[in-house]
Design a protein with these regions (language model features):
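Short pre-active-site segment immediately N-terminal to the catalytic Zn-binding motif
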Residues: 4-14
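Charge-rich, well-structured scaffold segments of protease-associated domains
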Residues: 8-9, 22-196
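Short N-terminal amphipathic alpha-helix/helix-capping patch enriched in small hydrophobics
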Residues: 14-15, 32
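Active-site His/Glu-centered metal-binding helix of metallohydrolases
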Residues: 15, 19-23
Length: 196
């Protein structure tokens, strides 16, 4: 199973990457803080991930166990269409970025899962060079932007713009879904139609 969305970034704030992380931080049907971690620990999955590309964000899963496969589909579908990001701003702050003060004499710093992940990515000279090449070759396209987020620009992303990006791109008519394997595809499609 795979659900993906066209998510072209208009800047380098990393909004698509931050949403990829945050939709997996609980949803309407699965209100636990981090269902992704729970799935990794308790599922029979053979593949479970989420990835942000320059023009799309994808959520693939695989399992040889039919019951587990259905459960994984349910968790991922609810995560992308009914995430807790609208209820809890803290999810955005934790996974995206926030200001932090260790003590009253320390400088204010920026922290966040995606922010720190991308600081690591930007520490590689090869990656910096490749990003500059894409920016030079395709200046007026989505490839000129850093879909994962540039640490310099990530703090420019507001909570409101982040939610607007989810509303704009995370709906069924902007998604592509595929199923592969030994299963009753009509049954899965009926379930998706009924539930989402």
């Amino acid at each position: 199973f795979y659900i993906g969305f066209r998510t072209p970034p208009e800047d380098s704030t990393g909004v698509a990457h931050i949403i990829e992380h945050t939709v997996l931080c609980g949803s309407e049907k699965y209100p636990v803080k981090d269902p992704f971690v729970e799935l990794v620990k308790g599922s029979l999955n053979t593949f479970l991930n989420a990835m942000t590309y320059p023009e799309k964000t994808i959520y693939p899963i695989a399992s040889c166990n039919a019951r587990d496969f259905q459960n994984l589909m349910s968790v991922y579908m609810d995560a992308v269409f009914h995430p807790n990001i609208y209820k809890y701003k803290e999810i955005f702050r934790q996974e995206g970025w926030h200001y932090e003060l260790e003590d009253k004499d320390a400088p204010v710093t920026i922290n966040g899962v995606v922010y720190n992940e991308m600081k690591g990515a930007f520490s590689s000279p090869d990656d910096v060079l490749n990003r500059q090449i894409l920016n030079s070759l395709f200046p007026d396209t989505t490839y000129a932007n850093v879909s994962g987020g540039d640490p310099v620009h990530i703090p420019e992303l507001s909570y409101e713009d982040y939610l607007d990006f989810h509303r704009r791109y995370y709906h069924p008519c902007n998604s592509y879904i595929y199923l592969y394997g030994d299963m009753d595809v009509a049954e899965k499609l009926d379930w998706m139609d009924r539930e989402y």
